[in-house]
Every structure is written in C-alpha cells, then in structure tokens.
Amino acid sequence: MIQFQPVLGSLKSYEAGKPIELVVREFGIDPDQIIKLGSNENPFGCAQPVVEAVQKAASKMPYYPDDSYLELKTALASKFDLTPDRIILGNGSDQVLDFACRCVLGPGDSILINRITFAMYRIYALQCGAKVHSTETVLHDLNAFLDLAKSIRPKIIFLCTPSNPIGDALFKSDVYDFLRQIPSNTLVVIDAAYMEFGKKKDSNTFISAKEVTDLFPNVFYTGTFSKAYGLGGMRIGYGIGSKELISNLYKMRPPFNVANLSALAATEALKNESHVESYLDNNLKEMKRYEKFAAEQSVEFIDSYANFITFFARKRGKSSTEISQSLLKQGIILRNLRSYDLNAIRITIGKPQQNDRVLTALNQEFS
C-alpha cells in the first residue's frame, strides 16, 4: 500500500464556486438562463482587443512560450514603475503564493492568517508541514495580528486586502504602521487580488506595489488578471518583491508555468485599461443597489471594497444554505459561506440586468 504524507489526513481540497455545467446537470436549467455570480469573475469579460489578439495567435498553441515572459513582465514593470527582475508570474496568483510558502516554510514553522481569509494560505502552509495560526475576528484586526505575531513568531504573515472572501479592506496607513513593527525576517504577503476595486471606492485603501516593496523588502505583493481584467479562465497572476526575494522564488518555479496565450492576453489587457475602468464604475454603481436593498430589508452586510458583497442570513429565518440553494434552483449561482463558518451568502456584483434578477429573488428570501 502506498504510504501518503501524514499531513494529507488533515487537508481538504479547495472548494471552488459552482460551475454553470454542474447546475445544468443538477437542475436541468437552460445554461443561457443561469447567472453565475459566485466566483467574483468580471461579468463583462475581458476587453474585445484581448479576445481578438488571442484568436489571432491561436496557431501558437503547439509551441512552448518564451520562458522569460519578458514582454509581459516589461508591461507590468511599466505599470508599476519598477524593473522586470522584481516580478514573477504564476498560473494564477495562487501559484506565486505557493512559491512563497515553499520557499520560506519548513516542518514546524508557522504562518499567521485572519480567521476568515483565502483558503489556499492554510492549504499551502500545511503542505509544507507548517502550523497555521489565525486571529479570532471576522474582519482584519491588525492589533490582533501584532499580538499573535509576538508570541508565535510566524515565518509568513498573510494580509488579504481587500479581503477574500468577505470584502473588508485595510487602510494603507494602518498597514504601514503594522509593517514597521514586524521583524524584517518575517515575510509579509499582501494579497492584492481585489486592489483595483478598493482603490476605486476609497484611495486610502490603495497600497502601491512599488512603494511598499521598496520600503519593506520583506513584503511580497501579489496580484491577478482574473478579477478586474476578466481573465479568470486564462489563469495568470503575478508577484512583486525585492530582487533577492524574486530570484529565490524563481527556484520554485517550473518551466513554462504560464501558457503563451495567457501571457499574450494579459499583455494585451494592460493596453486596455479603459475597459477595466468602465467595469469598476459599474461595480461601484451596482454595489450601491445591494447596499440599498440591505438597508431597506434590515439585512446585515459587510462594507465591501471588492467586486462582491456579503449578506448575513442570521435572524432572517432561513440559513445561508437554504437561501443559496433556493436561488440555485432558480438558476442563480451565489457563494454560500457556510464552509467559512459564516451564516452568510456572497454575491458577485453583476451586470445591471443580472442584479435586477438577483435582487428580486433575494427580496423573496429576506422579506
């Protein structure tokens, strides 16, 4: 019998949002009538020039990409005003998070995370044999982080801001005050997958990748093309840090870890920032409709700096599982946060007509 690593006994695979195909099989609903607002994807998709560029380059599929990815890294370097050797690309930003864990953690080491946060931090750490410590608060509390950091001395601290899965955000000034109190030999990962949305809502939440990694060489800043840029299906993200950090992370990177068409799509997306701005405008406008609904129905929610909103189901008679299942039967895919030990649902902000349908359905559930 194969002897598997003991840590696998305590590991659970990441639970992704329900795909449209599964809902079709489960409920027999016409796929064209299904609204997928459970995985925080861009409902408008990527910019049309990105689609055209990928279609034009389809003949490149048989060939490996340029493993230096210099064109994309140069474009990102220009965007962030730094040099390409401070950037590493990944098959989604979660891959560069994996690089960081494997580069720093060993058996018996510790990480520090928020109680409610992106599940992959825990998974990657456990895969390395590390211990996972978390705060007790739902929202990020940097004082709680500091208290724990002093006692457990973690090798890595993860700050997800704006937060996945619930959308709260930290102010830049508070993050900088926190970083000044963290030992320089502790890696602090700032997961900025939703930073574009936070910046749009309140510039005080914006953390510059260049500035923070210049001031604090122990910071690793990660971002993605999956959310604001609408390239979730292309699986491409990036990490930014000091030259020393990036050069060591590269030792964990497999060859050709980003597909050539994905790299091309990301490069083209950076030339079409107006598409992103249009989406951010829609997100902010439509978010207010959900906030208005919550106020009218006395539904508790979390002030969100991302492209989704979290509604709590407590004191409403129905659980988050019942609500999400009821909407699923109507062809509306939301995210039930019960797996995070929250009696809450999370709704990706969609197109206006999609939100019309969701709000009508939610009115029936919460009234």
UniProtKB/Swiss-Prot annotation:
User: PTM N6-(pyridoxal phosphate)lysine: at which residues?
Assistant: K227
UniProt keyword annotations, A-Z: Amino-acid biosynthesis, Aminotransferase, Histidine biosynthesis, Pyridoxal phosphate, Transferase
Q: Which Gene3D superfamilies match?
A: Aspartate Aminotransferase, domain 1, Type I PLP-dependent aspartate aminotransferase-like (Major domain)
One Pfam family name is Aminotran_1_2
Q: What is its EC number?
A: 2.6.1.9
User: Which reaction(s) does the protein catalyse, per the Swiss-Prot or TrEMBL entry?
Assistant: L-histidinol phosphate + 2-oxoglutarate = 3-(imidazol-4-yl)-2-oxopropyl phosphate + L-glutamate
Q: Tell me which cofactor or cofactors this protein depends on.
A: pyridoxal 5'-phosphate
GO process annotations (BP): L-histidine biosynthetic process
Q: Which family does it belong to?
A: Belongs to the class-II pyridoxal-phosphate-dependent aminotransferase family. Histidinol-phosphate aminotransferase subfamily.
Q: How does it assemble?
A: Homodimer.
Protein name as it appears in the record? Histidinol-phosphate aminotransferase
Species per Swiss-Prot/TrEMBL record? Leptospira borgpetersenii serovar Hardjo-bovis (strain JB197)
The top of its lineage is: Bacteria, Pseudomonadati, Spirochaetota, Spirochaetia, Leptospirales
Q: Which gene encodes it?
A: hisC
